Amino acid sequence: MLTSRAEIILRSIVRQYITKAVPVSSSSILEDCGLDICSATIRNEVVRLEIEGYILRPHHSAGSIPADKGYRYYVESLKDVELPTNDKFLIRHLFHQVEKEMEEWLNLTVAVLSQRVQSMAVVTMPRQTQGKVHHIELVSLQDNLVLVVLILRGAKVKQQLVNFENVVSQPELTLISNRLNDAYDGLTRFQIEQKPLGLNHDELKVKDSLVKMMRGEDEQESREPFFDGLHYMLEQPEFHQNQRAQEIMQLLEQKKLSKMIVPPMPFNRGVQVYIGQENASAEIRDYSLIVSQYGIPDEAVGTIGVIGPTRMAYERALSAVSYLSLVMSTLVAELYGKAPVDKDE
């Protein structure tokens, strides 16, 4: 745990480096932090911060730059940051100006977020997290060949052929359909798999068919995310070397980046921050990722976020991602006829 003085010095280093993108000297820290101490004390504190892994000094005669651990300490102190009221009003106004269509909202979201953070923003289309049974129908085609029709919540229809052991009549299939509808209405595939029902061999085949169709729907890849703001990120000093710019461009062109920056996480409307080495994918461990989910739990959930170098304007990014996820959750709730999220106007 850092002392209060060390924390003030670390925050000064992080803030100045984020703003200026050059190593921070002891004299700059002394001018910025407002502590009544001498330069020698600053230098001693800087050495301790380096030993403990919070900062890096490329050369001992040069200034300090934050390490991932230093950024993490800084970010933890920003958990409750919010957008200014005027900015919230402006964002609401912008959303009221566009058509009430999901693609319009998503395009506006990434445009606003990337402009505010001056980095690349991403948002995914909200999709159902787990399919739920709405209705099951079994149709006799010929002899023992049966068509299993599954209607999911949201009116998605799936169907699959199943061979029964013996010839079965349509009235018998209707009885099985009714039994399964009573048992499985509103359930996810996980709940169906765990629900004991005492099924016979043919009914188990139907159950397996239902689970297979629902798994395919659950695992179906969502549409490619909406991106904006690549030009902001490439203007940062970290990308003045062509190699790094080419690497991020290749990830975008090969459609790898979308999978890397939309990590699976439980829906909680909270903002998650992944700094440098905290990212699961080795290819983005020189970056920071700030993401949040939005939408309606268990019905329609998307992801909104921003990616950029670890030298990111975290305060702006956290507040913008948090507020835009709230705005999008409210819009999705209204679209689905649900109670709106607190608009926090």
UniProtKB/Swiss-Prot annotation:
Alphabetically ordered keywords of this record: Repressor, Stress response, Transcription, Transcription regulation
NCBIfam families: hrcA
Pfam families to which the protein is assigned, alphabetical: HrcA (PF01628)
Taxonomic placement: Bacteria, Bacillati, Chloroflexota, Dehalococcoidia, Dehalococcoidales
Name of this chain's protein: Heat-inducible transcription repressor HrcA
Gene: hrcA
GO molecular function: DNA binding
Family: Belongs to the HrcA family.
Any single GO BP term: negative regulation of DNA-templated transcription
PANTHER family referenced in this protein's UniProt entry, alphabetically: HEAT-INDUCIBLE TRANSCRIPTION REPRESSOR HRCA
Free-text function comment from the UniProt entry: Negative regulator of class I heat shock genes (grpE-dnaK-dnaJ and groELS operons). Prevents heat-shock induction of these operons.
